[in-house]
Curated annotation (Swiss-Prot):
Protein's name in the database: Cytochrome c'
UniProt modified residues of type Pyrrolidone carboxylic acid: Q1
A Pfam family matched in the record: Cytochrom_C_2
Quaternary structure note: Homodimer.
Localization, UniProt: Periplasm
Listed GO MF terms: electron transfer activity; heme binding; iron ion binding
Post-translational note: Binds 1 heme c group covalently per subunit.
Keywords: Electron transport, Heme, Iron, Metal-binding, Periplasm, Pyrrolidone carboxylic acid, Transport
Lineage: Bacteria, Pseudomonadati, Pseudomonadota, Betaproteobacteria, Burkholderiales
GO biological process: electron transport chain
Function: Cytochrome c' is the most widely occurring bacterial c-type cytochrome. Cytochromes c' are high-spin proteins and the heme has no sixth ligand. Their exact function is not known.
InterPro entries in alphabetical order: Cyt_c/b562, Cyt_c_II, Cyt_c_prime, Cyt_c_prime_subgr
Main localization category: periplasm
Species of origin: Alcaligenes xylosoxydans xylosoxydans
Residues that bind heme c: R12, Q13, D67, C116, C119, H120
Amino acid sequence: QFAKPEDAVKYRQSALTLMASHFGRMTPVVKGQAPYDAAQIKANVEVLKTLSALPWAAFGPGTEGGDARPEIWSDAASFKQKQQAFQDNIVKLSAAADAGDLDKLRAAFGDVGASCKACHDAYRKKK
């Protein structure tokens, strides 16, 4: 799928950076620092939902490197569980955005953030 291991590293880093960008755009709304615009939230969640499926294939065997810790490959089952928890939380975030319910959106947003943090704490090298 990737010609060189470094291509996989760049691909997953790019996908994760874009996810962080679209997630971050919703933070002021969730924190009550910006008005709730349902259409804008839905647009960001839709992009996030699409992006959330992308980086995982770029963590295949032989693609070690970047900010990824070796435990991704040595404890692949746990990594996959955290990946699945994240994607399950994205589905909940999408449902909350579709419902237009700010309280549900806040709760789901928190769950997505917590799943991001759990994976980063376990599998991303400290900067």
